[in-house]
């Protein structure tokens, strides 16, 4: 559906959708005198916004202007360093009030996007700076700090424990911030395991390893909690240690975060788990030699993404929560003491502009620029996974050949899908003037970007929206296809059509991922694009052409290149991107996403991942073994989520090895970047 009202140009596509649909997807089922209805309950929740102010404006001026209107209920998060970014909680009025709010957004803000709702702050009238946590433990901070933003932190597992001089054990996990908004502390004899964060973020709970004596009263640390679940004869009861604290992600034998954390900071590095690399023979047994690198003894700060966020596999929620997670990790870094902070983020969307200008990408650029190791601040490095969408048919590319031109393709939605599905169409702003995007259902009902669709509607196309300083995008959505009492969208082949494409202009389209994240049971299914003309005329011959480990798809609108994780398309010295390769032959892992980024205004364009790391031992033995949620357990995680922590571990050492099989052709550089690195 075209937007139902004129929005400020800074409003992002998903904020617009939420307003147009009256925040339907954030609503709660309520009952009043037997009448059932859905409402966004502002007594329990606030909108959570990720804001970028204009270059000639300041966050402080925008904050002051919004706070002058009590009806907006604005609650700003801590300042994001000296950058142009801010996080903000507010009532719906703050983004719908035409008289006062909308003019302020137009005056001050360059971009604003919506994350999943959050509870109101406990202290709405006062804003705090980031709380300095660096000196609040029993031991002083070190020169190195590792941060992980993930799901599942097995802090009591043996690979993350160290032996004290007293003979006891202590976890190397300095702190965990669990972002689940309804998490409650466990109280034992008047002391709490898990503390709120009222002085800065004010949602979720944090769990510290230990506390300085002046701060320890009434608090139970991670080491204390481990001690409560340990006996000299039987060791640590990890099952009850996690279950009694409500760490639901650790109820499973496997967890995404447990694997990533072991690869990055475990005591047995990946090079000791795999057979010898050249000139050795990979078929020989691994050495199992304990690590002597800095990561094997480093302290870790872990941010646990909330269950609500992890259930939404699209990654639309990511920017605000990831930004605050990075701020939390940095709050443990001490000026002039902590020299390096390395943060691993293995999540990311398949959507976005893919030219380095997605809002979270530009925020990461600003943070690594500010935290560059000068002025007493640590050097910040962020390591990202390249993504796993190379073969998911989630990227369409079309270039106009005549004036004007048009293109159409199929968006295939499975039956019984339980979640809202999104796709995005992107073009350069200068080429978008005459573009019309149309979505047609399997039964023939059409929705257009220039026609307002009455509400409620099972599908729609948003009006053209400024996606960045250089781009225009159109949001395409289809509601769940599972049978329910409400409005049900058709499953099957929907058609997306783009008309008015200028000569030589490029159209890019991306499907938002919906298949569930690890251990998340949502009933969601993956949708994907199909080029019907290519399928009818060329797919048979293409299925007989197998080159460099891939079946040919030449001539198809579906492009495998240009599929990098939507957070991983900027070219920054402090932001690193890791793809995967197969140890057997050194080729890119079949699923590992490839570059290049779309062309944009940035001076440097990302061509591919920085490097590729071992992600599969062979084509039959996919994945890489690393730790599960209990001591001694291992499992194979398949995907570039296993590559990012390997590259991060090399970044910790600040000295990368010489890559093998360095690519020279543009196509191979887009796939494997600087070449194949041996595991750390």
Predicted regions and their residues:
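Amphipathic alpha-helical segments in well-structured domains
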Residues: 170, 257, 319-322, 326, ...
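Autoinhibitory propeptides
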Residues: 2-146, 151-172, 565, 573-574
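Active-site core segment of subtilase-fold serine proteases
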Residues: 7-10, 153-262, 272-293, 445, ...
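Catalytic-core segments of hydrolase enzymes
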Residues: 147, 152-158, 173-177, 181, ...
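C-terminal subdomain of the subtilisin-like protease fold in secreted/lumenal serine endopeptidases
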Residues: 333-336, 340-349, 380, 392, ...
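Short, small-residue alpha-helix embedded
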Residues: 642-657
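Subtilisin-like peptidase catalytic core
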Residues: 243-352, 437, 636
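Catalytic-core environment of secreted peptidases
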Residues: 203-244, 436, 440-446, 451, ...
């Amino acid at each position: 559906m075209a937007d139902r009202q004129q929005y400020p140009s800074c409003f992002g596509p998903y904020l617009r959708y939420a307003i147009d649909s009256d925040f339907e997807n954030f609503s709660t089922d309520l009952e009043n005198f037997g009448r059932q209805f859905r409402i966004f309950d502002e007594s329990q929740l606030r909108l959570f916004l990720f804001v970028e102010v204009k270059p000639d404006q300041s966050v402080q001026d925008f904050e002051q202007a919004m706070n002058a209107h009590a009806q907006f209920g604005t609650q700003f998060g801590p300042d994001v360093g000296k950058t142009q970014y801010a996080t903000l909680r507010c009532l719906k009025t703050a983004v719908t009030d035409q008289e006062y709010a909308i003019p302020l957004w137009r005056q001050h803000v360059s971009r604003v996007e919506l994350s999943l709702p959050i509870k109101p702050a406990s202290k709405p009238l006062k804003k705090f700076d980031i709380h300095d946590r660096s000196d609040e433990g029993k031991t002083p901070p070190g020169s190195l700090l590792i941060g992980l933003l993930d799901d599942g932190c097995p802090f009591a597992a043996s690979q993350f424990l160290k032996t004290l001089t007293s003979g006891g054990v202590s976890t190397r996990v300095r702190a965990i911030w669990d972002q689940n908004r309804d998490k409650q502390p466990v109280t034992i004899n008047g002391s709490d395991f898990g503390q709120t964060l009222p002085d800065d973020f004010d949602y979720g709970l944090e769990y510290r390893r230990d506390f300085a004596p002046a701060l320890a009263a009434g608090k139970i640390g991670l080491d204390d909690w481990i001690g409560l679940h340990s006996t000299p004869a039987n060791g640590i009861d990890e099952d009850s240690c996690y279950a009694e604290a409500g760490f639901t992600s650790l109820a499973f034998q496997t967890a995404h975060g447990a694997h990533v954390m072991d690869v990055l900071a475990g005591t047995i590095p990946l090079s000791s788990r795999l057979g010898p690399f050249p000139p050795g023979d990979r078929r020989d047994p691994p050495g199992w030699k304990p690590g002597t690198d800095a990561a094997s003894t480093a302290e870790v700060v872990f941010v646990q993404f909330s269950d609500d966020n992890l259930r939404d596999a699209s990654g639309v929620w990511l920017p605000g929560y990831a930004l605050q997670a990075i701020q939390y990790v940095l709050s443990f870094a001490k000026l002039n003491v902590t020299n390096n902070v390395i943060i691993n983020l293995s999540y990311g969307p398949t959507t976005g502009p893919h030219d380095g200008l997605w809002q979270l990408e530009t925020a990461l650029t600003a943070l690594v620029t500010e935290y560059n190791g000068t002025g007493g601040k640590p050097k910040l490095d962020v390591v990202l996974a390249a993504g796993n969408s190379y073969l998911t048919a989630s990227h369409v590319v079309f270039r106009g050949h005549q004036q004007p031109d048009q293109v159409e393709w199929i968006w295939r939605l499975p039956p019984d899908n339980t979640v809202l599905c999104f796709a995005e169409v992107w073009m350069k702003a200068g080429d978008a003037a005459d573009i019309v995007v149309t979505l047609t259902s399997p039964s023939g009902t059409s929705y257009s970007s220039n026609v307002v669709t009455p509400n409620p509607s099972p599908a729609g196309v948003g009006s053209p929206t400024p996606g960045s300083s250089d781009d225009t995008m159109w949001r395409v959505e289809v509601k769940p296809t599972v049978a329910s009492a409400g409005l049900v969208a058709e499953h099957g082949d929907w058609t997306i059509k783009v008309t008015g494409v200028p000569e030589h202009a490029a159209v890019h389209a991306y499907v938002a991922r919906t298949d569930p994240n690890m251990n998340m049971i949502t009933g969601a299914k993956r949708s994907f694009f199909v080029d019907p003309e290519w399928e009818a005329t060329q797919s048979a011959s293409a299925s007989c052409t197998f080159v460099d480990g891939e079946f040919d798809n030449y001539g198809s609108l579906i492009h495998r290149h240009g599929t990098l994780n939507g957070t991983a398309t900027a070219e920054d010295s402090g932001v690193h991107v890791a793809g995967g390769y197969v140890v057997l032959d050194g080729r890119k892992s079949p699923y590992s996403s490839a570059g290049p980024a779309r062309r944009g205004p940035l001076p440097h364009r990302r061509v591919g991942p920085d490097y590729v790391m071992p992600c599969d031992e062979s084509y039959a033995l996919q994945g890489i073994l690393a730790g599960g949620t209990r001591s001694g357990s291992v499992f194979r995680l398949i995907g570039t989520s296993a590559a990012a922590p390997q590259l991060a571990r090399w970044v910790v050492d600040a000295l990368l090895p010489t890559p093998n099989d360095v690519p020279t052709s543009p196509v191979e550089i887009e796939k494997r970047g600087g070449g194949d690195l041996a595991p750390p």
